[in-house]
């Protein structure tokens, strides 16, 4: 019987053919925790009486939400993870010395691999599906169960085939494609399903575009997002010291899908998600007509904090100045991205334009620190959520966009079409 890529990944892990709707127990290749969620997992682990990790090399802790610590509480949270990592000689522990946002850092380190089953106590764990893996977010107690047993229970998800056709125009990115998908199907349109991205557009999308798309699959309610392994994936992994051998799968031509969604990417404008849902998408053309003035532009997060994002921002900002009424904050996804951006001159361009470049952190995205919005302030942001109060005050507003839109809007002072 024909299978989707997701069904094949689970089948290989279980040792028999499994299909959508089945409840299975499955070993996990990589379990991911961060400074916010891991302390809860550690408590559950210790309360269970467990004294060892089932798969130490398959467990990563990345301190990224409030690192360097923003206050005493976050410092104490981080210490719990540090002490645990030291106690168990955890190889894959990342703090200030080798820091980054978890969903940017782990692919960089070769710790997530095609064909993997990956879970993380963070909803945007679905990012890693861009490498041809099944990757999903779970709760902290689910994480603890995997720490103890090496596996977990899953219902094999049904799949929605997203058939993307055409070559994207300049400044239309993976971020715009996923915002358009969410606009079409809504924030619960893919509930407990896999969004499988296919079609002629895929060959034109960089690995960074694919990370952005899979990252925001959860914003449509999806269990995961996935892009099959191809030459772009191969090129990205070529210089990585991979934790495991890739296991490459492709959906059968006659695999069963609950829905097929066709999108003409060639005619797609950059998309702006208006407050207060990622599904509230509008063309950047309409947004410019609406003359939406901004107080802050933010470029970063696990969605759009990669080198290509800093590159396009620098290209637009070169020789320009940020509008006097606007703050521009740029947060690279990892130290390596920061280092490369500095080497290529992007950091100087951003700073010369009046922007501020921070250390890698999730901070501003979740309204934690390093870019919180005040009462009634408006931001254009490359992050993934724009709920009420997401980046600060409950009276603030966040418009989601790609990095080119954020950069040109920072210069103009209102949401602007970069084309």
Swiss-Prot record:
Record-listed E.C. numbers: 4.2.1.33
GO molecular function terms attached to this record: 3-isopropylmalate dehydratase activity; 4 iron, 4 sulfur cluster binding; metal ion binding
Keywords per UniProt: 4Fe-4S, Amino-acid biosynthesis, Branched-chain amino acid biosynthesis, Iron, Iron-sulfur, Leucine biosynthesis, Lyase, Metal-binding
PROSITE patterns according to UniProt: ACONITASE_1, ACONITASE_2
Cofactor: [4Fe-4S] cluster
Biological processes, Gene Ontology terms: L-leucine biosynthetic process
Highest taxon above the source species: Bacteria
Binding site for [4Fe-4S] cluster: 302, 362, 365
Cofactor mode of binding and number, as noted: Binds 1 [4Fe-4S] cluster per subunit.
Catalytic activity: (2R,3S)-3-isopropylmalate = (2S)-2-isopropylmalate
Pathway as given in its UniProt record: Amino-acid biosynthesis; L-leucine biosynthesis; L-leucine from 3-methyl-2-oxobutanoate: step 2/4
Pfam families: Aconitase
InterPro entries in UniProt: Acnase/IPM_dHydase_lsu_aba_1/3, Acoase/IPM_deHydtase_lsu_aba, Aconitase_4Fe-4S_BS, Aconitase_4Fe-4S_dom, HAcnase/IPMdehydase_lsu_prok, Homoacnase/IPMdehydase_lsu, IPM_dehydratase_rel_enz, IPMI_cat
Gene3D superfamilies, sorted: Aconitase, domain 3
Subunit structure: Heterodimer of LeuC and LeuD.
Record's function text: Catalyzes the isomerization between 2-isopropylmalate and 3-isopropylmalate, via the formation of 2-isopropylmaleate.
PANTHER family (alphabetical): 3-ISOPROPYLMALATE DEHYDRATASE LARGE SUBUNIT 2, HOMOACONITASE, MITOCHONDRIAL-RELATED
NCBIfam families for this protein: hacA_fam (TIGR01343), IPMI_arch (TIGR02086), PRK00402.1 (NF001614)
Family designation: Belongs to the aconitase/IPM isomerase family. LeuC type 2 subfamily.
Protein name: 3-isopropylmalate dehydratase large subunit
Organism of derivation: Sulfurimonas denitrificans (strain ATCC 33889 / DSM 1251) (Thiomicrospira denitrificans (strain ATCC 33889 / DSM 1251))
């Amino acid at each position: 019987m024909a299978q989707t890529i997701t069904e094949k990944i689970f089948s290989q892990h279980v040792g028999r053919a499994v299909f959508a709707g089945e409840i299975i127990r499955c070993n996990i290749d990589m379990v991911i925790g961060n400074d916010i969620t891991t302390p809860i997992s550690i408590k559950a682990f210790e309360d269970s009486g467990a004294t060892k990790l089932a798969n130490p090399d398959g467990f990563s802790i990345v301190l990224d939400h409030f690192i360097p610590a923003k206050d005493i509480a976050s410092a104490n949270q981080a210490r719990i993870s540090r002490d645990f990592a030291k106690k168990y000689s955890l190889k894959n522990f990342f703090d200030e010395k080798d820091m980054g946002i978890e969903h940017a850092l782990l692919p960089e380190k070769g710790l997530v691999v095609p064909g993997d089953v990956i879970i993380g106590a963070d909803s945007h764990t679905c990012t890693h599906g861009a490498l041809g893996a099944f990757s999903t977010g779970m709760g902290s107690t689910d994480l603890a169960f995997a720490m103890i047993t090496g596996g977990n229970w899953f219902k094999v998800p049904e799949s929605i085939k997203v058939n993307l056709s055409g070559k994207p125009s300049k400044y239309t990115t993976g971020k715009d494609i996923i915002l358009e998908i969410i606009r079409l199907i809504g924030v619960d349109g893919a509930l407990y399903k896999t969004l499988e991205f296919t079609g002629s557009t895929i060959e034109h999308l960089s690995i960074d575009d694919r990370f952005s798309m899979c990252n925001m699959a959860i914003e449509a309610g999806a269990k995961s997002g996935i892009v099959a392994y191809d030459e772009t994936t191969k090129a990205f992994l070529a210089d990585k010291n991979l934790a495991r051998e890739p296991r490459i799968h492709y959906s059968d031509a006659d695999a069963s899908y609950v829905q097929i969604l066709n999108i003409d990417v060639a005619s797609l404008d950059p998309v702006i998600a208006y407050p207060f849902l990622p599904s509230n998408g509008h063309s950047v053309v309409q947004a410019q007509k609406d003359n939406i003035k901004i107080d802050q532009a933010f470029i970063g997060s696990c969605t759009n904090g990669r080198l290509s994002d800093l590159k396009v921002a620098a290209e637009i900002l070169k020789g320009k100045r940020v509008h006097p009424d606007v703050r521009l904050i740029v947060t690279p996804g990892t130290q390596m991205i920061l280092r490369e951006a500095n080497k290529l001159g992007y950091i100087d361009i951003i700073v010369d334009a009046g922007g501020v470049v921070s250390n890698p952190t999730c901070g501003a995205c979740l309204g934690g620190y390093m870019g919180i919005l005040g009462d009634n302030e408006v931001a254009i942001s490359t992050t993934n959520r724009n709920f009420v109060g997401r980046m600060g005050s409950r009276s603030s507003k966040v418009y989601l966009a790609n990095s080119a839109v954020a950069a040109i809007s920072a210069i103009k002072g209102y949401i602007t079409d970069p084309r």
